[in-house]
A protein has these predicted regions:
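Short, intrinsically disordered C-terminal tails of secreted or membrane-associated proteins
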Residues: 480-485
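Hydrophobic alpha-helical transmembrane bundles of multi-pass membrane proteins
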Residues: 2-434
Length: 486
């Protein structure tokens, strides 16, 4: 009998006993559990658990739609509350339909492509379970339909970013018309470049764990374009350049929206681990949850302190945006950093969102909820912050193959193991130094002169710890490139 399966079934029996099942009934349940367990393989159980985890994570991300709705309704004027709520509920339905009809097949096409092929309407046939039953090393570890559900709520998230930025200025039907284009074409195409096996992921090794760039920066870029087109709200900016604050009508509602988003982000980042049925995957999910929570906390306090220093008092809206900025910042890689580094990444995000909001006001770019700053400015920081704990994210620079987690593998995920955090921490400074110096030296004739010195800096006194060995290899590859210069 499979011991793993038996453990789960015995746990269920124990739970039943706790709720008043008699000893005789419990014995019958144990016998039934043993009979069921004898016919279930570990692969089947892992498949069921990973699929269930995927679906629950997707449900958490869907709940973020409520968070965006509450946040935006709280930060706009009361006369526009119904309109902003209507936009949010309608955009979610629009995103689901467009991603079903076009978007999903656009996003997941042939590897290495710049433009996707055209294959309309998602097929409801799911042969993943058959493959699991057949066994083999390439057996998937979750249902492909659960993957669609998880991805479609990401699309709705990207479009929700746009709705807040253009609040109080864009008519409903014009907004929904853009939502059709955004969710059916724009988001899937740029998502295909990376997550869908396109050129960014396959050729350049671009790393974005849960979508700081793919989801949040995409939504912010679209929001910025629309905000520039529709212009600021009437009365927002005076003729002499002064900024006239337009406070939100319901800050308690905005705070509720922040906490809903904070909660949903655990599914957003945690679900992007793609599996939970193995020990490694379960530990990774726990690490992602902790780092996500710490980054949000760091971002909130950083923005709150910045407001205190700048305005002389605490500002709730800045604190809310600081928490969201911390979440966006850690989304690109919530797995690799330590909890302390994740907090620091969130702190930088909180500072950046404060500065960005004030800077956009100077440019007379009116963003009622701070969406462009939270998801755009901090989204860029999140993508760059990947290098702080994961040097492999830039392996394409010197031609090294990038280690990545496969789209589908066995339940144990044996093909993908994270680098120990201690090795990552020790090698971060050396790797960053070699990358930056190598990029510069490759382009100048003096590279041959400074190449050997670069190698010595990266490999001080011949010490060959694991991170230094990796860094020395990078330096050697850079030097070989330098020697090819004319």
């Amino acid at each position: 009998m499979n011991r793993s399966v038996m453990k789960w079934l015995m746990l269920a029996v124990g739970a039943g006993a706790a709720f008043g099942v008699s000893a005789q009934e419990a014995e019958v349940m144990v016998e039934a559990a043993a009979e069921v367990a004898s016919g279930i393989s570990t692969a089947e159980l892992a498949y069921a658990l990973d699929t269930f985890y995927f679906l629950v994570s997707g449900a958490f991300v869907m709940w973020m739609a409520a968070g965006f709705s509450m946040l935006e309704a709280g930060l706009v004027r009361s006369k526009n509350t119904v309109e902003i709520l209507t936009k949010n509920v309608a955009l979610f339905a629009t995103a689901c339909i467009m991603y079903l009809l076009i978007g999903y097949n656009f996003m997941y096409t042939e590897a290495g492509m710049y433009f996707p092929g055209l294959d309309l309407i998602l097929s409801m046939e799911d042969h993943a379970a058959d493959v699991v039953n057949a066994g083999g090393e390439d057996a998937p570890y979750y249902s492909s339909l659960s993957d669609f559900f998880f991805q479609v709520v990401f699309v709705a998230t990207a479009m929700s970013i746009v709705s807040g930025a253009v609040a109080e200025r864009m008519k409903l039907w014009a907004f929904l018309g853009f939502a059709v284009i955004m969710t059916g074409f724009i988001y899937p195409i740029q998502g295909m470049w990376s997550w869908g096996g396109g050129f960014l992921g396959e050729t350049f090794g671009y790393s974005d764990y849960a979508g700081s760039g793919i989801v949040h920066l995409c939504g912010a870029a679209a929001a910025l374009a629309l905000v520039i087109l529709v212009g600021p709200r009437k009365g927002k900016y005076a003729a002499d350049g002064r900024v006239n604050p337009i406070p939100g009508a319901n800050l308690p509602l905005a705070a509720l929206g922040m906490f809903i988003l904070w909660m949903g982000w655990f599914g957003f980042n945690g679900g992007s681990e793609l599996a939970v049925a193995s020990v490694d995957s379960a530990n990774n999910v726990a690490r992602v949850f902790v780092n996500t929570n710490m980054a949000a906390s760091g971002g909130l306090l950083a923005a709150l302190l910045m407001a205190k220093f700048r305005f002389g008092k605490a500002d709730l809206t800045m604190a809310i945006n600081g928490a969201l900025a911390g979440l966006v910042a850690i989304t690109a890689d919530p797995l690799s950093p330590s909890a302390g580094l994740a907090t620091l990444i969130g702190v930088v995000g909180g500072v950046l969102v404060f500065v960005s909001i004030l800077f956009l006001d100077k440019l007379k770019i009116d963003d009622p909820v701070g969406a462009i700053s939270v998801h755009g400015t901090v989204g860029i920081w999140g993508v760059l912050a990947v290098l702080l704990a994961n040097g492999d994210a830039t392996s394409w620079v010197c031609g090294l193959p990038k280690r990545k987690k496969p789209k589908a593998s066995t339940s144990s995920n044996a093909a993908w193991k994270p680098i120990p955090s201690s090795s990552r921490a020790n090698g971060t400074v050396n790797a960053a130094r070699s990358y930056a110096a190598g990029l510069l030296l490759r382009r100048v004739e003096w590279g041959r002169v400074f190449g050997p010195a670069l190698f010595r800096v990266c490999n001080v006194d011949g010490r060959q710890s694991a991170p230094r060995q990796a860094t020395a290899l990078h330096c050697q590859l850079f030097i070989s490139e330098l020697e090819r210069l004319p």
